Amino acid sequence: MKLKAIILAAGAGTRMKSKLPKVLHKVCGRTMLNHVIDVAKGSMVQECIVVVGHGAEDVKESLTPDVKTVLQKEQLGTGHALMMAEPYIDDGTILVLCGDGPLITEETLNRTVAYHREGNFKATVLTTDLANPKGLGRIVRNAEGQLEKIVEEKDATEEEKAIIEVNSGIYCFDGEILKEALPKLKNENAQKEYYLTDILSIIRNMGFGVGVYKLEEYEEIMAVNSREQLADVEAIMRRRIAKKHMANGVTIMNPEHVYIEKTVTIGADTILYPGVILTGNTVIGEDCIIGQNSRIEDTIIGDGVEVQSSTIIHSKVGNFTHIGPYAYLRPNSNIGEHVKIGDFVEVKNSNIGDHSKASHLAYIGDADVGQNVNIGCGVVFVNYDGKNKHRTTVEDNSFVGSNSNLIAPVTVKESGYVACGSTITKDVPEGSLAVARARQENKEGWTKRKGLLKK
């Protein structure tokens, strides 16, 4: 039987106090809405439909082409939102999800759908018990323990407010019965809204079975309505991600102080120190050490690499290379194996071959550096003429002395040497020493003549 997910994402989220639609706020690098869609696709769902409203165009742009959308022009309640998706409701199973609930898991969705189908229910609600249920809809059961109704707190009596079983906002419906029930929905409540929760009572009054599937933990159904709740949800997501990596053989020295996005891959026996930030489609190999306060974004790191307190963005680092401390690899830096990029070295849009090193205080921009090359302290690859960027090539086994400038476009041929303090404007031939600096002149007695002698 076909399973569709209708995801409610039309709300303004006024308590977020943000220009950004609520469902587009990110949790561990991915929007809340896309977290929900990912989970739906990872379960048994074959098709996702998102109900958009506030910030509709921005929300649509965040979605992949296979996700369909319907517009709720007026926000008249969750039931009204479901009405807008009526053209997509058929005789299969309809799973209704909340776009601001990113912690729901595939396992829970699969179990809920299985419970719904095996019990031959026409509607099922996912619930849990909560010690402090303030603000949430209460599950009212009859004497036999069956669902009688779901009542929103603003419409609840004092007796109903004392109930601790709460509504998750996640439902399963038989599509054919849901289509029959939707036209019967009324807005006779304190908010003058069409409550989705009333549909369950309607289906029950139609003579069909309504199921209640209770979760043991509240965590999965937490919704985000404020910045504080966003932080709470992200903390849980971070903990989940860290646990997954630790279960796969990664050592995380202080999981509460490491930020890893869901899309990151980390190899076994890698160690992460506090303050590490790993984002995007970063892949880190095995046996690496990622030192404190390192930030790595959309980068591929080989095996046995050590990164100390450095930033690496959109780059690639080969096996057994050492980066940092305080190095900065900007986009399109391709670093080979057994390379050393030391403290306060910046690399941008450059290729650096195996066994080469730039140990400290250098700028390597728009360069092609070969194997076994030494870049001395204070070397600058001068790549910009005020209008255009130009490339510099330093071939294998070359040596660039400290405090030298390589004015692009220029090439240092294989085994070429550049003397310290030189400004190179012409190609250096293979096996040659280039010296491009003024000759030293010593003026004897100058200090005494100027009255500067301290003795």
Swiss-Prot record:
Major place of residence: cytoplasm
Superkingdom as given in the UniProt entry: Bacteria
Keyword Transferase among UniProt keywords: yes
Recorded GO MF terms: glucosamine-1-phosphate N-acetyltransferase activity; magnesium ion binding; UDP-N-acetylglucosamine diphosphorylase activity
Pfam families: Hexapep, NTP_transferase
Region (Pyrophosphorylase): 1-227
Enzyme Commission identifier(s): 2.7.7.23, 2.3.1.157
Residues annotated to bind acetyl-CoA: 383-384, 402, 420, 437
Catalysis performed (reactions): alpha-D-glucosamine 1-phosphate + acetyl-CoA = N-acetyl-alpha-D-glucosamine 1-phosphate + CoA + H(+); N-acetyl-alpha-D-glucosamine 1-phosphate + UTP + H(+) = UDP-N-acetyl-alpha-D-glucosamine + diphosphate
Positions contributing to UDP-N-acetyl-alpha-D-glucosamine binding: 8-11, 22, 72, 77-78, 137, 152, 167, 225, 330, 348, 363, 374
Residues binding Mg(2+): 100, 225
Family, as annotated: In the N-terminal section; belongs to the N-acetylglucosamine-1-phosphate uridyltransferase family. In the C-terminal section; belongs to the transferase hexapeptide repeat family.
Subunit structure: Homotrimer.
Name assigned to this protein: Bifunctional protein GlmU
Organism: Alkaliphilus oremlandii (strain OhILAs) (Clostridium oremlandii (strain OhILAs))
